[in-house]
Amino acid sequence: GLELEEAFTKSREKGYIDTVTKVGQAPKIYRFDNRSSAARKFIQTQNEHLVKNTCFICATDRLALGINQGLQSIGVEVPADFGIIGYDGVFLDQVSSPKLTTMKQAIVEMGEACGELLIQKIEHNDTSQRQQRFLPQLVVRESTR
């Protein structure tokens, strides 16, 4: 998880807890600043307590990248020993080795909707507020099996 009190962090955490609980598992949450170095250090300091065949479900791709770096630094294999799933899918998921499985946000669709809303507000002097929900998509790559 992230050490932020923001709506998106709470939403991601709730989704994780609900899903893990639904399949009969107990959720484990560790909160970090959104820095890969914090996640890497966590792995390096928790080395003796890590249970193989665990999948790290990370609040961001940046944290997932740090988990990956930490696991590689202690000599374990991803995805053979541990799985990693990130969240965002905007760049970092593609630069890691192995490439990260991620929950990809609909960034293009968000931008298009934002532009359309802005044009509508300008053309029609529209001051109303609206919310739109965009669902992420699971993109399976090399960090899970």
Predicted segment positions?
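Short, well-ordered alpha-helical scaffold segments within catalytic/effector domains
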Residues: 13, 36-43
